[in-house]
Amino acid sequence: AKCDEGAEKTVVIYWMYDTMPVTQPDVWIAPPFEGRLVEMAPFKKVLVGRGATNSKGPQMAQWNALMSIRAAVGKLPVNLIFVAEGDEERMSIGYRQFVRQHPDLFKGATAMYRFGSQGFSGGGELSGASEGCVYVEITTSGTKWGRGPTVSDIHGGNKRSVDSPAWRHIKMLQTLVSDDGNKILIDGFYDNIEPLSKDEQSKLEAAAKGVDMDIAAKNLGVARFISDDPLTYLKMARYGTSMNLDGIWGGNMYAGGAGAILPNKITSKHNFRYLPKQDGMDITRKLRAHLDKHGYQDVEM
């Protein structure tokens, strides 16, 4: 959608309306797909629903603000192009095609993505950083390894005499990151990362002065951050990289009770966050090379 105000400058506003599936509906205080106003301290009434914060709520607030300015002033100081996609959670495949097919639409334009960043204090935050994301599933199986259970899970008592793909998977994961999980040990991962410009550094330092670490932790629901220094925290949050362990599954997945299983295979899911000069496919190639180098040629990606 376009909003042509006859201005010299044009801003492309990116929106996304898809969400991830609801995996824990029992922890929601209201039906996730209903959209319900509920009382929640310290905000009084809040809207609870899937995508309320990421990102349909902030997008609607942005739209209301822009239309209010337009109604009060007569027109906006810039032209607007709204580009909304429902494919973000699948790596924006359709969006990439759209950009390639309509290069003139984006020529000379500034892009902006408005995320919900209001915290307990009521203040907002303007972020000038960007990131890429790659999801990877890694599987270790006795079938590919040629050791341990090669057809299906077997009784856990057999571990006394049979190798375990599960333990092999855990040992493999230990080669990928430092002991605290905060440094990626894949050769070449940090290649092509450019240092911050003077302008970026000065803006970061200015923003750090307004960061209350206690409020930031409360907003996110964590006890503390990797660093207690506001500037370091902000630099990590905006310009950092990571390899996260999203989840791991295989074998006996039921909590409590008895049940001895020696799994045939274990799978873990990960997401890499990387910076503009890095490349997602290059990162996956380097991950494959790392696994091969450390003797895990049988591990599948």
Give short role names for the model-derived ranges.
Residues 1-2, 157-160, 267-275:
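Short, well-ordered beta-strand elements within core beta-sheets of diverse protein domains
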Residues 18, 87, 118-120, 143-145, ...:
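Short, glycine-/Ser/Thr-/acidic-enriched flexible segments
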Residues 27, 74, 127-133, 237, ...:
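Short glycine/proline-enriched loop/turn "hinge" motifs that connect secondary-structure elements
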Residues 43-131:
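Acidic/histidine-rich catalytic neighborhood of metal-dependent amide-processing enzymes
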Residues 136-141, 264-272:
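Oligomerization/assembly interface segments of phage tail-like spikes and tubes
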Residues 162, 255-264:
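Short, solvent-exposed beta-strand/turn "edge" segments of beta-rich domains on protein surfaces
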